[in-house]
Every structure is written in C-alpha cells, then in structure tokens.
UniProtKB/Swiss-Prot annotation:
All residue ranges annotated as the Protein kinase domain in the record: 55-313
Positions with biased composition (Polar residues): 586-600, 627-637
Catalytic activity: L-seryl-[protein] + ATP = O-phospho-L-seryl-[protein] + ADP + H(+); L-threonyl-[protein] + ATP = O-phospho-L-threonyl-[protein] + ADP + H(+)
Keywords (A to Z) from UniProt: ATP-binding, Kinase, Nucleotide-binding, Serine/threonine-protein kinase, Transferase
Gene source species: Xenopus tropicalis (Western clawed frog)
InterPro entries for this protein: Kinase-like_dom_sf (IPR011009), Prot_kinase_dom (IPR000719), Protein_kinase_ATP_BS (IPR017441), Ser/Thr_kinase_AS (IPR008271)
Gene from which this protein is expressed: hunk
Residues binding ATP: 61-69, 84
Any GO MF annotation of the entry: ATP binding
Region (Disordered): 405-480, 586-642
Annotated family: Belongs to the protein kinase superfamily. CAMK Ser/Thr protein kinase family. SNF1 subfamily.
Taxonomic superkingdom: Eukaryota
Listed name of the protein: Hormonally up-regulated neu tumor-associated kinase homolog
Length: 697
C-alpha cells in the first residue's frame, strides 16, 4: 500500500520510496539469495494499514495514553520490527514527554547491550513520531506472569541476573533508568530479557495490560523511598526497583500495597519494611537476597556490582565471569558481507555506512544493516554451516572469520565424530575381511591333489573340477597348479613357502574312479583282481599372462597313464619343478637294466611335436643307444633322475618357445599301435623308468 499523506521520509534510498512495489530480488554477490531477497508472498500476506518510508505499519501490539506500539515490516529485508507511534498533539500536552521525547533516542544511541532493545530508526511526520525498534517475539514478561500466576525460582534467577547485567551496563555508562518495572521487560525468541523505554516513564502502560498492579502501576509502585520523599538519589534507586521486580516474579504480587492508595502510606510501609508475606517454597538464599535489595536505607542497600556478585544470583553460573559489552561496534566486528552488499548493491555510500554503524546512530542505514545482519545470522544458525558455500565475498577476510563464530565449535565436534565413526567402520571392514580370508584359506590346503598317498584310493580316478573359491584362492590360479610334496608333513605352495600339511577334512571330496568307456581302454594285467588301472589327471597350466588360468576340461588324450599300483614317488629336492606336459611321448618301452619298470604314455593332439618326430634314431629318443648308455653309465648326466637336482631345469621361456614352434602334424597312428607293452610288476612297489624322461628334462 502507498504511504499515507504526510508520512514520507527522505532517509532511505530513492528506489525504496518511489513506486508501489518494493524491491523483491536483490543482488546475490555478497549474501545468500534467501538473505538478500524478499519473497512477494511475504509482502503480500503482511496485514498493514499504511506504509511509512520503508516500513509497513501493521497490527497493534499495545496502547497507552498517547503512544501505541505496532508491528511493522521492513520491505527491503522482509524482517519484522516493533514501531512505537507517538501522537504529536497528545505528546505536546505533556511537558515531561515534550522535554524527554528525544532523550530516549540519545540514550539508546549511547547504549549497546544484548539485554537492551536496539533502537533502529526514528521517523517523524506531520502528526506522529515513529520509533523503530527490534521486535521481541517472546512477548511481555507480564503476560507470562498472568499465565503462570508466578515464575519458578530457577527461571526468575535467570531473568533477574540478565536484568542486573543490563542495569550494570547502564550505570557504567552513567545512565539511571528510574523506571524499571515488569511492563518494561520483554522476551526475545530465545527467552532472554530485553529492557525497553528510556526516558519515557509516563508511557509505562503502552502495552495496554490491565493487571493487579493497575491501581499502583507506574513509578510509585516500583520507586525507591528516596524518590517518593523527593530526596537526593543515585543509581541505587534502580537496585530497589530490581527487588520489586524480583518479588513480583516469585509471588505474582507487589511487595508493598496500601488500600486505599496513598503515597504517604506507601512510603511509610516501605520505611517500616512492612513487606507482604513471602511464599514458604522460596529458598533462604533467595529471601535473603530479596530483603537486601528492598533495603529502605540507600547507604545499607547494595550497589549494582555488589548485587551482581550475590551467591544466589550466581548459582549454576560458576565460571561465567562478568562480560563487559562495548557501547560501540568495532571495525573488526562489522559484517563485511552486509556492508559491501549495502554499498555496492543497494546504493549506500560505503563511508556513510561505516560511520553510522560505528556511531550507532538510529537511522534507516542502521536499520538495514541490523536487519540484514540478523537475517544472515539466523540463516547460518538454521543451516548449521560454518560458512557460506555459495556467493561468498572474497574482498575482505573479516567476513570469513565472523561466520565461524557461531558454529565453529559445533562443526568441529560433528567433524571429529564423523572421523571416529569412519575409523570404526574401516576397522570393522578390515576385521570382516580377515575373517573371510581365514575361512577361505583352508580350501586350497585340503584339496585332493594335496592329499597324502595313503589317502588315495587304488581304483580309477574320477575327473574333478575346482570350485570358484579354489580358483580365486591364489588370484585366479588353480590350487592344483605346480604343488608337490617336498618333505614329510610339508608341501611347497605357489608362494614359495612351506605350509604344514593337515589331514583332509572328512567332507573333502576324494579322487573317484573314472567310468568313461570312451576315454579309457581296458588293460589286462596278470596281477590279481586287486590291481587295476589308475589314471592321474593333471591340469595343463602355462604360466602366461595372456592366457586365463582356468581349469580346462580334462580329456582322455590329455592325461598320464601310469601302470601299476600303488604308486610311490621318491621325494625330490625343493629346487625341482614339475613341468607342464608340453611334449608328446609315444612308443615308449621299458629300458633294459632297470628292475623296477614303469611305462607311461601321454596323448595330446595339440602338442607341437608329432609321434613320428620322435624316432628311435633321434638323439632325444628314449630308444637311442647313446641315450641308454649315457643314462646307465653316466649318473651325473642331467637326464638322469638321480642327478636331476644338480642341473638347471628348463625355464618357462624355453617351454613356451618349444610350444609355439610350428611343426606340421602328421597323421596319428591308431590307438592300438601306440599302446605300450604291459609288464607284470610287483604289487607293492612301482617306480619311473629314468629313460622315459630323456629329452623331457
């Protein structure tokens, strides 16, 4: 709504005054959008009767003989304020009001304290004065006493202590209030005391409450005896008034009352200490402190500093020393984000903004700064953030420090708790991983290939595939890969360390007999019904990074066939390696001169060597005479089994090069022609023929 006629003001920027619509969206360079802007809904829904300057005048909060208190809204910030409207015509009729009307503004310009209301702006029109103050949303303390009948002692202690702190600040500044009463005590949103009305004692009842104190409300009911006697007085008159307020909080009544009302009778009752009875539920310390405040003799009455040091007043406030608040804002305490926003975005002169804030002079500039700063603090408090993440002002470092004043401690505590929680979670994950590894580790230790010879059955061996857990136990390598017995009770693992042998678990699958008629041929041996054909399945594993180390399907052509049972292997040196079956052997026969004979064949169509390539006349053929003589005569030859550990074995690079040689394969001979001759052997012992390994090592 437009401003009423005659209610214009020239303090604010021109764009706040001209036009029907106030600015809605302000710049967001220095402040968050929710702080610098005002929603249209807020302006539209605020009920008001008129506009004066940058303020919308709303509902009435209280009313007195010549003044009214109304709720207002600042259109530039969207913040609510309290506006005291004083009628000029009625005020001129009262000489005391006319004399001291400007005194309140001068006093509040000198005073700055958290328990004293801040005067923000003063407007004057043809018919009225407008005093703009911060709005105390907690209401009046008188209203709280009406609702509860009285206030509990612990809560009254808090209010009295805050009131004494505010009065002590006034006395240090040389200001005596002289009109301290329940009606002048307001509560903010945090339930803290706010002291109002300086120099306008006759306006004590502007909030319009009708209460039991109405017959004796005002200065006489709260005034000290020296004031009623019109004697010289000092700051201790405020100490007496504090005692009356304390009595009213604890009991809901006044300490001195007379019927009918008479100033002479009231004064006499004060001098005689004829106080109304106190409730029995009050503590002796509270009663003693109350009586000391209501001492009629000013010389015996404590001053404000002595009252502040009382034991009852400081109960539950140990370690909280008296904090002195400066009456002026220091330059380093300024909110630089708000100052820069006002100077660069709202059109205020930077030097004027600084001077007004430091001098605490009530005007529109101070009101804009105060309201924006309060809005910013509430935003940071609600968001629980130590700093503004978006639209941070980088021109001055002071604003960076001020954002951490409220939430630095809470942020550090929350961060330390998060770090501790993360550390506990990581430890739990590590423990779970260790337990998982411990559960998975026995799987490769108790595999079939590592079972001792005594546990291997004498029948045909059944093909077995490794499970997924076994394949992953060595990073993708099969647990059957190049593991051999080195000494009794130990085995060599792929990690080149000795692991103690454990007896297999009863549930560990054992090698079963293979019943595949297509992959095996029946062999007639004259060794009794207990001797049967035994097949040992060996997995081909080439240690190549380009080939996945997976368990291949075993075929009849890819196996060693060892004749004779049981099989006995002599222990080998730890430096020996079991080579992967690369070469193809056929047409092998027992070597003369060896009593213990064992024949084996290895069929692999994928081998690069063909059966014909291994001719008896070749130097690598097991039937070569030179080979036989060398084996039988020279035991130090690397081809000899007994001296194999003394010579270097074939490396994996040589094996791969031999495997990759391109040899034109020839047609294979029938299986019957490649079958070795069967020889009867002792059932209790079988060994390898050393000549069969010639050329392989």
């Amino acid at each position: 709504m437009p401003a009423a006629a005659g209610d214009g003001l020239g303090e604010s920027p021109s764009r706040f005054l001209a036009g029907e619509k106030p600015p809605v969206q302000l710049a967001e360079s220095f402040l968050p959008a929710c702080v610098s802007s005002v929603s249209r809904e807020t302006l539209r829904t605020f009920q008001h009767t008129k506009r004066v300057g940058s303020y919308l005048i709303g509902r009435k909060l209280g009313e007195g003989s010549f003044a009214k208190v109304r709720e207002g809204l600042h259109v530039g910030t969207g913040e609510k304020v309290a506006i005291k409207v004083i009628d000029k015509k009625k005020a001129k009729k009262d000489t005391y009001v006319t004399k001291n009307l400007r005194r309140e503004g001068q006093i509040q310009q000198m005073i700055r304290h958290p328990n004293i209301t801040q005067l923000l702006d003063i407007l004057e029109t043809e018919n009225s004065y407008y005093l703009v103050m911060e709005l105390c949303t907690g209401g009046n303390l008188m209203h709280k006493i009406y609702e509860r009948k009285r206030i509990e002692e612990h809560e009254a202690r808090k209010y009295i202590r805050q009131l004494i702190l505010a009065v002590e600040h006034l006395h240090r500044a040389g200001v005596v209030h002289r009109d301290l009463k329940i009606e002048n005590l307001l509560l903010d949103e945090n339930n803290n005391i706010k002291l109002i009305d300086f120099g306008l004692s006759n306006c004590a009842g502007i909030l319009g409450y009708t209460d039991p104190f109405s017959t004796q409300c005002g200065s006489p009911a709260y005034a000290a005896p020296e004031l009623l006697a019109r004697k010289k007085y000092g700051p201790k008159v405020d100490v007496w008034s504090i005692g009356v307020n304390m009595y009213a909080m604890l009991t809901g009544t006044l300490p001195f009352t007379v019927e009918p009302f008479s100033l002479r009778a009231l004064y006499q009752k004060m001098v005689d200490k004829d106080m109304n009875p106190l409730p029995t539920h009050l503590s002796p310390a509270a009663i003693s402190f109350l009586r000391s405040l209501l001492e009629p003799d000013p010389l015996k009455r404590p001053n404000i500093q002595q009252a502040l040091a009382n034991r009852w007043l400081n109960d539950n406030y140990h370690g909280k020393g008296l904090h002195t608040y400066p009456n002026r804002i220091h330059l380093e305490d300024l909110s630089q984000s708000v100052v820069l926003h006002m100077s660069e975005k709202l059109g205020y002169k930077h030097s004027d903004v600084i001077n007004v804030i430091l001098s605490n002079r009530a005007c529109h500039t101070l009101a804009v700064y105060f309201l924006l700063n309060r809005k910013l603090e509430n935003y940071l408090l609600n968001m629980r953030k130590p700093d503004i993440n978006d639209n941070v002002c980088h021109k001055n470092q002071f604003h960076q420090l001020e954002k951490y004043k409220m939430n630095k401690n809470s942020y550090e505590e929350r961060r330390s708790k998060d770090l501790e929680k993360r550390g506990e979670q990581q430890q739990q994950q590590q423990r779970a991983m260790q337990r998982k590894l411990e559960k998975c580790s026995p799987s490769h230790r108790q595999s079939n290939c590592l079972t001792p010879q005594g546990h291997i059955s004498k029948g045909p061996v059944k093909e077995r595939r490794s499970s997924k857990s076994e394949r992953e136990s060595f990073g993708g390598l099969s647990p059957f890969h190049e593991v051999r017995i080195t000494k009794p009770g130990c085995m060599t693992s792929c990690s080149l360390e000795y692991l103690e042998m454990q007896s297999p678990d009863p549930r560990t699958p054992k090698i079963m007999r293979r019943q595949d008629s297509h992959s095996q041929e029946t062999v007639n041996v004259n060794m009794g019904s207990r001797i049967r054909e035994t097949h040992l399945n060996v997995v081909r594993s080439f240690e190549s990074v380009n080939r996945e180390d997976q368990i291949e399907s075993l075929s009849p052509n890819h196996q060693y066939r060892v004749l004779g049972s049981p099989v006995s292997f002599s222990p080998r040196h730890s430096s020996e390696r079991i080579l992967s079956p690369i070469f193809q052997f056929d047409n092998t026969s027992p070597i003369k001169g060896h009593s213990n004979q064992a024949s084996f064949t290895y069929d692999d169509k994928s081998s690069p060597s063909s059966p014909e390539s291994m001719s008896p006349t070749s130097p690598h053929s097991p039937h070569s005479p030179s080979c036989n003589n060398n084996i039988s005569g020279n035991l130090g030859s690397p081809n000899c089994v007994r001296s194999r550990g003394r010579f270097p074995m074939m490396g994996i690079g040589q094996m791969l090069r031999k495997r990759n040689q391109v040899v034109s394969p020839k047609a294979e001979k029938p299986l019957e022609t490649r079958m070795p001759a069967l020889h009867q052997m002792s059932p209790g012992y079988a060994s390898f023929n050393s000549s069969d390994m010639n050329g392989f090592c």
